[in-house]
Amino acid sequence: GCIGCGACAKLGRCAFDGVVNEFAEKLGEADGFVFGSPVHYAAASGNMTAFMDRLFYSAPKEAFCRKPAAVITSARRAGTTAAYEQLLKYPGITEMPIVSSCYWNNVHGSRAEDIQQDEEGVRIMRVLGHNMAWLLRCIEAGKAAGVPEPRKEPLARTNFIR
């Protein structure tokens, strides 16, 4: 995971080479994102948490800003909503419109075949896909119609301890 070394501020990428930097190089090509994780101990997997921490800390915030994001979690039984809330924090702090569905974006099952039996979960995923596609079309239509993006607010930092 991210060790908070700050090297990314100087390098423009994570100091540790690998999948995070490979993914970050492709951010500009994406119109939106779907991030998903299995649930381990009522949280997103350690691998996904480490990936998201490093990606969102080291990549330029402009690469995420105003690009729609959805998060999905999958578990055998429980913990999906806690993991879902955990993953929502990343797009929530980078000005990404969060795409929702008709329920929390969770499916249940240990294997892909099991998930297909989760009729409600599969429906939630279909609605999520439709909503993501619709929002992407709305953004494109807004750009074509000349609707300006919101102006960038100047950075303001506050420490809680003074």
Segments and roles (model prediction):
Residues 2-4, 65-68, 143:
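A short alpha-helix capping/helix-coil boundary motif
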Residues 1-4, 47-48, 110-114:
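Short secondary-structure transition/capping segments
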Residues 13-105:
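Helix-loop-strand module that forms the ligand-binding subsite of alpha/beta enzymes
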Residues 97-162:
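Glycine-rich phosphate/pyrophosphate-binding loop and the adjoining helix
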Residues 1-27, 156-162:
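Cysteine-cluster motifs in flexible loop/terminal segments that predominantly coordinate metals
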